Amino acid sequence: MKFAKGHGTQNDFVLLPDLTADLALTPAAVAALCDRRQGLGADGVLRVTTAGAARAAGVFDRLPEGVVEGDWYMDYRNADGSIAQMCGNGVRVFAHYLRASGLESRDEFVVGSLAGPRPVVLNALAGVGADVTVEMGKANQLGVGAATVGGRQFNGLAVDVGNPHLACVDAAMSSRELAALDVAAPVVFDAAQFPDGVNVEVLTAPEDGAVSMRVHERGVGETRSCGTGTVAAAVAALAHQGSQTGSLTVRIPGGEVVVTITDANSYLRGPSVLVAHGDLADEWWAAQG
């Protein structure tokens, strides 16, 4: 079984080309594949298929709103095997893989997801790297909330980027203090407000057009980056300074991206790197069930 490995600002993924969408991506198999000791290791799995094939194979009962059968479809699974609606870093790596593998010849096309269609632009391809912009859709503010991260309570802005986020700006926190925060520890949040869980971002206040951010992703834990999280962080940071639109550089442990928020849309631009291609042992995969 063929696979590829890639990352977007060190948010890493195993890509499984499966154009007929007939692989059994059970939670146990996905979790084993993402395990950094017994599997390949990753923050998530990206099945590479089309929307029509995914629907025909029963991956979903009906096409997500705005997605058509001919669109590419990113079937994304978290490291614990759960299904996720959207992954901004994953879309960049997914689009890069399509172009680099020859499955796609265009530099502009649409990637479907459970959160809907995500138009992409490959700005540059160079060796194993790419610079990709993703149209992420409108980021909707859903009020305020609070979460406990690393034993500290933070107030934040709830933001829907196709998946739920609580982005917490701490104006008193320095980048050094943020780096010392135990983001890997389990987070505590209002389950009534976020019944399906939530991704929690903690970030510094904007300075010179940039913020620093760390993230605890639902179903994964702390990751080096989270694409949708950087969009949510940009929305919260702009709101913190009294703005609804603008562009910010978001610095995460895995690198940096540029997020642009408009009245009707949001855009995520950043790198993708494809680091490996190979074959999974069929016997190992079959044993994961």
Swiss-Prot record:
<keyword id="KW-0413">Isomerase</keyword>
<feature type="binding site">
    <location>
        <position position="78"/>
    </location>
    <ligand>
        <name>substrate</name>
    </ligand>
</feature>
<keyword id="KW-0028">Amino-acid biosynthesis</keyword>
<dbReference type="GO" id="GO:0008837">
    <property type="term" value="F:diaminopimelate epimerase activity"/>
</dbReference>
<dbReference type="GO" id="GO:0009089">
    <property type="term" value="P:lysine biosynthetic process via diaminopimelate"/>
</dbReference>
<feature type="binding site">
    <location>
        <position position="11"/>
    </location>
    <ligand>
        <name>substrate</name>
    </ligand>
</feature>
<keyword id="KW-0457">Lysine biosynthesis</keyword>
<dbReference type="Pfam" id="PF01678">
    <property type="entry name" value="DAP_epimerase"/>
</dbReference>
<comment type="pathway">
    <text>Amino-acid biosynthesis; L-lysine biosynthesis via DAP pathway; DL-2,6-diaminopimelate from LL-2,6-diaminopimelate: step 1/1.</text>
</comment>
<keyword id="KW-0963">Cytoplasm</keyword>
<feature type="site" description="Could be important to modulate the pK values of the two catalytic cysteine residues">
    <location>
        <position position="217"/>
    </location>
</feature>
<feature type="binding site">
    <location>
        <position position="163"/>
    </location>
    <ligand>
        <name>substrate</name>
    </ligand>
</feature>
<feature type="binding site">
    <location>
        <begin position="227"/>
        <end position="228"/>
    </location>
    <ligand>
        <name>substrate</name>
    </ligand>
</feature>
<comment type="subunit">
    <text>Homodimer.</text>
</comment>
<comment type="similarity">
    <text>Belongs to the diaminopimelate epimerase family.</text>
</comment>
<dbReference type="GO" id="GO:0005829">
    <property type="term" value="C:cytosol"/>
</dbReference>
<feature type="active site" description="Proton acceptor">
    <location>
        <position position="226"/>
    </location>
</feature>
<dbReference type="InterPro" id="IPR001653">
    <property type="entry name" value="DAP_epimerase_DapF"/>
</dbReference>
<comment type="function">
    <text>Catalyzes the stereoinversion of LL-2,6-diaminopimelate (L,L-DAP) to meso-diaminopimelate (meso-DAP), a precursor of L-lysine and an essential component of the bacterial peptidoglycan.</text>
</comment>
<feature type="active site" description="Proton donor">
    <location>
        <position position="87"/>
    </location>
</feature>
<feature type="binding site">
    <location>
        <begin position="88"/>
        <end position="89"/>
    </location>
    <ligand>
        <name>substrate</name>
    </ligand>
</feature>
<feature type="site" description="Could be important to modulate the pK values of the two catalytic cysteine residues">
    <location>
        <position position="165"/>
    </location>
</feature>
<feature type="binding site">
    <location>
        <position position="199"/>
    </location>
    <ligand>
        <name>substrate</name>
    </ligand>
</feature>
<feature type="binding site">
    <location>
        <begin position="217"/>
        <end position="218"/>
    </location>
    <ligand>
        <name>substrate</name>
    </ligand>
</feature>
<protein>
    <recommendedName>
        <fullName>Diaminopimelate epimerase</fullName>
        <ecNumber>5.1.1.7</ecNumber>
    </recommendedName>
</protein>
<dbReference type="InterPro" id="IPR018510">
    <property type="entry name" value="DAP_epimerase_AS"/>
</dbReference>
